[in-house]
């Protein structure tokens, strides 16, 4: 493990990303990063800007000790611009993505106990989308995901505005897509957040942020109280810090416009968005802004906390919640080509 470089605090800033680890194995963008039993599983991604073929390696990062190791596992797939989700507390399912020659809608699963990759089969009733990349997969329950968005040409505009439910069965090693009746604005490089609705009997809604010329989130699913059993990680201290941060800001009705390839993590009633690439500028397109979407009241409010530290600019990165801390992993920096080898945690000065 190489030494950790200190970025420091930008003058007047109320927050920063503080480096806690550094390893060349972590340097990648457009990868997936999934927490399982206190370890982060990084799958695939691009190792440098302009790379045509994605990585096929899997790296495990242990945040408790700050160490990363490459997992040697048979059948590791070439993937970037994919998404991943856990099934059965054991199988890390990688959904879709770019393999260097085409977009896929197939499912590859890492059996984390046997450390072997498996190619799962489609059920006979499978109705898959066109190949997926820069899409999102959101867990609704163990073995059920909501899939939205994808990259593609204009002739497939309607289809990549479609929403799919993806059922995953680890017992039979199979999957099945079902197209939902609703559609959204076509988008890619967006993020998705399953958030509680305001009120005395909160249900849930799935919101899509960014990935198109839009300033507000779009609803990709709504569920009445008690329908969603998926439990978010408990992060009481981080939630308190976010509440204090937004209390110091000015709430807005509109969020960031035309943002893509940013990160998003749900912390209680807050969606925490960071970085990404803006489509509103021809130059200096990679961002280092922190946005908080606060759903505690109706209507929800946006809070924007910019940074003057250009070293924090990221695109194609991931954030991951563990042990009451929000971690930033990978991504390309300001030049859009150099992958960051650092792991950072979100730190506040309030």
From Swiss-Prot:
InterPro entries per UniProt: Gal_Oxase/kelch_b-propeller, Kelch-typ_b-propeller, KLDC9
Tell me the ranges holding the Kelch repeats: 39-89, 91-137, 325-350
What keywords are assigned to this protein? Answer: Kelch repeat, Repeat
Q: Name one GO molecular function term.
A: cyclin binding
Xref: Gene3D superfamilies: Kelch-type beta propeller
Residues that span the membrane, as ranges: none
Report the domain of life of the source organism. Answer: Eukaryota
Pfam families per UniProt: Kelch_KLHDC2_KLHL20_DRC7 (PF24681)
Quaternary structure, from the entry: Interacts with CCNA1.
This protein is called Kelch domain-containing protein 9
Organism of derivation: Mus musculus
What lineage, starting at the top, does this entry show? Eukaryota, Metazoa, Chordata, Craniata, Vertebrata
